[in-house]
Amino acid sequence: MEIVSTGNETITEFVLLGFYDIPELHFLFFIVFTAVYVFIIIGNMLIIVAVVSSQRLHKPMYIFLANLSFLDILYTSAVMPKMLEGFLQEATISVAGCLLQFFIFGSLATAECLLLAVMAYDRYLAICYPLHYPLLMGPRRYMGLVVTTWLSGFVVDGLVVALVAQLRFCGPNHIDQFYCDFMLFVGLACSDPRVAQVTTLILSVFCLTIPFGLILTSYARIVVAVLRVPAGASRRRAFSTCSSHLAVVTTFYGTLMIFYVAPSAVHSQLLSKVFSLLYTVVTPLFNPVIYTMRNKEVHQALRKILCIKQTETLD
């Protein structure tokens, strides 16, 4: 595909190149990623329905988990439809549409960064201060944290989008990614994007490194607390759960940090797309499995839901 400049004319749309350099795999990719998208929606919807329908799951840990699942559904849905379109035909998106996609995806991803930190802190309180936990994480506290994470995401990315919206784009209009990636998007501006870039860098450092540091600190203290428990099945289960949670969290935060805090670390655009898949597709796919893997309460609620559905089908 030839990339051409449009000169000094203001462009009205962008072309998302996606995986344009391997057209022979487009149909296979379409099938695979459609299946993955369906699994993401179903897996996360089951978690939400289980938490809403089961009185036993009306606890902070599960309220946070349901919100995480909702975030995963929304921000994956902000990206994947255009990616799937690119496997079948040339995917175009208007400048306004690109701004909207970046705002929705960025806001939800920022909210997820903050929510993951809240979830780690919640587990720290539950494990290290079990007697005081009901007071430390009461209904007003955990609902306030949920609302704060959502609002913070939209406020932070709303500021960035307001700055980007002032830029002028006059070509080229090709984005070598499967979604409107911020760095590539503002890199195409023919007006000075430095204010938007510096602002994004500062906000990214704040919204990524601080929550990630809180997560690492929380899990470190959890590990110390677990080490005091006599060796046995419960201790092994706790370590297994912590390690699986950290694996998902590290993948999510690590790829975002590479993109928005140290973008020069990615020298290959193909590698950039692979990293993008990790936090746009892989993490939302595995979050429901990882966070409910050893949870009997969630398993019981899910079995109840599936049995009800099966009974209704038979009737």
From Swiss-Prot:
Disulfide bonds join 98-190. It is a multi-pass membrane protein. It comes from the Eukaryota. The keyword NADP does not apply. Glycans are attached at residue 8. One of its GO terms (molecular function) is G protein-coupled receptor activity. Gene3D superfamilies: Rhodopsin 7-helix transmembrane proteins. The chain crosses the membrane at residues 28-48, 57-77, 101-121, 141-161, 199-218, 239-259, 273-293. PROSITE patterns: G_PROTEIN_RECEP_F1_1, G_PROTEIN_RECEP_F1_2. Residues 1-27, 78-100, 162-198, 260-272 are extracellular. One of its GO terms (cellular component) is plasma membrane. The keyword Coiled coil does not apply. It is found in: Cell membrane. Belongs to the G-protein coupled receptor 1 family. Odorant receptor. This is Olfactory receptor 11A1. The gene is OR11A1.
